[in-house]
């Protein structure tokens, strides 16, 4: 779900948030919730990812953050892990195009299912969802290049999914 697509929206600011960060954190702790951010290594050199990290740094109660990262090297992955090292919840940096993933996907292809696909954010999302869903009932997805990302974004995305009284269920 994305609420920053101009005229086309799926979840926007419907006034569901009560601007009570304590209550929101309690909701997060009642239902295991993860955030997934598909991202290219180049995005770590841009301001948006820093805004996202800053906004999420106060979000205790989150089960995990999954960064589905397209990177050129293990050093890039280590740099991404270091970038998110101080978060108040577990962060898993998944190397979407790393050797282990490529080997796994090639072995699946040999069995007759070609899931190699062209690398990109869509491919990263599918991989990241598998990881995020291991420990979470609710998964929110944000792009890594949202230049207006702020502290209200996680609540606006997740509150309708966390509270069944809003009438949104999957």
Predicted regions and their residues:
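Active-site-proximal specificity loops/subdomain of glycosyltransferases
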Residues: 14-15, 76-136
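Short beta-strand/turn micro-motifs composed of small residues
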Residues: 37-39, 69-71, 140-143
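N-proximal low-complexity "stem/linker" segments adjacent to membrane-targeting elements
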Residues: 1-58
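Short beta-strand-to-loop acidic/aromatic patch adjacent to the donor-nucleotide binding site
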Residues: 135-147
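Structural beta-sheet core signal
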Residues: 35-37, 65-67, 170
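Short beta-strand/loop segment that forms part of the nucleotide-sugar
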Residues: 61-73, 92-98
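Conserved donor-nucleotide/metal-binding helix-loop-beta segment in metal-dependent transferases, i.e.
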Residues: 149-170
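Short, charged/polar "capping" segments at the starts of alpha-helices
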Residues: 45, 72-79
